[in-house]
Amino acid sequence: MLSMSKAVKARAHTWYTIDMEKGVFRFNKRLCPRCGSVMAYHKEPVPRWHCGKCGYTIFESQAPRQRPSRGR
């Protein structure tokens, strides 16, 4: 349980970008295509988006590694 001495930081305002000229706001995070929940971004060990509710994972594409030639 949280003690009263610890302050809880509000993070919800970082999830949106507001464009005042157009009068629109945009959600910065990804939504899960399977269940619709908000997905978390993980940098380590492999960059990916992961849904904690259903387990769906989207791996970010990386530059393909070149295989060494076999000398044939």
From Swiss-Prot:
<feature type="zinc finger region" description="C4-type">
    <location>
        <begin position="32"/>
        <end position="54"/>
    </location>
</feature>
<keyword id="KW-0479">Metal-binding</keyword>
<dbReference type="InterPro" id="IPR011332">
    <property type="entry name" value="Ribosomal_zn-bd"/>
</dbReference>
<comment type="similarity">
    <text>Belongs to the eukaryotic ribosomal protein eS31 family.</text>
</comment>
<dbReference type="GO" id="GO:0008270">
    <property type="term" value="F:zinc ion binding"/>
</dbReference>
<keyword id="KW-0863">Zinc-finger</keyword>
<dbReference type="GO" id="GO:0003735">
    <property type="term" value="F:structural constituent of ribosome"/>
</dbReference>
<dbReference type="Pfam" id="PF01599">
    <property type="entry name" value="Ribosomal_S27"/>
</dbReference>
<dbReference type="GO" id="GO:0005840">
    <property type="term" value="C:ribosome"/>
</dbReference>
<dbReference type="InterPro" id="IPR022845">
    <property type="entry name" value="Ribosomal_eS31_arc"/>
</dbReference>
<keyword id="KW-0862">Zinc</keyword>
<feature type="binding site">
    <location>
        <position position="54"/>
    </location>
    <ligand>
        <name>Zn(2+)</name>
    </ligand>
</feature>
<feature type="binding site">
    <location>
        <position position="35"/>
    </location>
    <ligand>
        <name>Zn(2+)</name>
    </ligand>
</feature>
<dbReference type="GO" id="GO:0006412">
    <property type="term" value="P:translation"/>
</dbReference>
<feature type="binding site">
    <location>
        <position position="32"/>
    </location>
    <ligand>
        <name>Zn(2+)</name>
    </ligand>
</feature>
<dbReference type="InterPro" id="IPR002906">
    <property type="entry name" value="Ribosomal_eS31"/>
</dbReference>
<keyword id="KW-0687">Ribonucleoprotein</keyword>
<keyword id="KW-0689">Ribosomal protein</keyword>
<protein>
    <recommendedName>
        <fullName>Small ribosomal subunit protein eS31</fullName>
    </recommendedName>
</protein>
<comment type="subunit">
    <text>Part of the 30S ribosomal subunit.</text>
</comment>
<feature type="binding site">
    <location>
        <position position="51"/>
    </location>
    <ligand>
        <name>Zn(2+)</name>
    </ligand>
</feature>
<dbReference type="GO" id="GO:1990904">
    <property type="term" value="C:ribonucleoprotein complex"/>
</dbReference>
